[in-house]
Amino acid sequence: MRTLVIASGNAGKIREFQGLLQHLPLNVQAQPQGFDVEETGSTFAANARIKATAVAAMAGSWALADDSGLSVNALGGAPGVHSARYAPTDPERIEKLLGALSNASERHAQFCAALCVAAPDGSVLIEVEGRCDGWITTTPRGDGGFGYDPIFEVSCTGLTFAQMPLTEKKSHGHRGKAFALLEPQLQDLLSAEPR
């Protein structure tokens, strides 16, 4: 069975990917603790590629990397590729973002997820992107999810990601949409392998 290393130290992302990948014939593993890849790209896709190729080379197996983030219209697209580094912790990131929007009437935002699967030789096997439109709430709502999930209300649902069960988040969310594009390509790669 092919090993696929999730190129992330984020426990929430790892759990989400393990759930999304559970029905595929893959041995899904987290990247080794303490291995960190500097995200120097200017786009989500570039950062996903940087992480996937570095982790695949280090682990000697395929690696799946995600770079995702939140872009808020009223903030000129910020926090964008700096979403994870906008402040030190999830609660501080939420507080900082809500503070930046305290007087804003325009609260539209978009989550983007770029996924990349790379091989140990550095080749990129798959690259896809998924997006989800919504807006930033004035206060956190819900106990699920991670990151900005409690303050991102998904368009046409009335719910934040933190209020959604994983199945609903998968169908509406940026990562789920990206995964829907990635999954058939990953299945094709797996079925093309010699047995």
Swiss-Prot record:
Pfam families hit by this protein: Ham1p_like (PF01725)
Chemical reaction(s) catalysed: XTP + H2O = XMP + diphosphate + H(+); dITP + H2O = dIMP + diphosphate + H(+); ITP + H2O = IMP + diphosphate + H(+)
Superkingdom of origin organism: Bacteria
UniProt xrefs under NCBIfam families: RdgB/HAM1 family non-canonical purine NTP pyrophosphatase (TIGR00042)
Cellular component GO terms, alphabetical: cytosol
Keywords: Hydrolase, Magnesium, Metal-binding, Nucleotide metabolism, Nucleotide-binding
Listed SUPFAM superfamilies: ITPase-like (SSF52972)
Record protein name field: dITP/XTP pyrophosphatase
A single GO BP: nucleotide metabolic process
Enzyme Commission designation: 3.6.1.66
Cofactor(s) needed by this chain: Mg(2+)
Record note on cofactor: Binds 1 Mg(2+) ion per subunit.
Its biological purpose: Pyrophosphatase that catalyzes the hydrolysis of nucleoside triphosphates to their monophosphate derivatives, with a high preference for the non-canonical purine nucleotides XTP (xanthosine triphosphate), dITP (deoxyinosine triphosphate) and ITP. Seems to function as a house-cleaning enzyme that removes non-canonical purine nucleotides from the nucleotide pool, thus preventing their incorporation into DNA/RNA and avoiding chromosomal lesions.
Cysteines joined through disulfide linkages: none
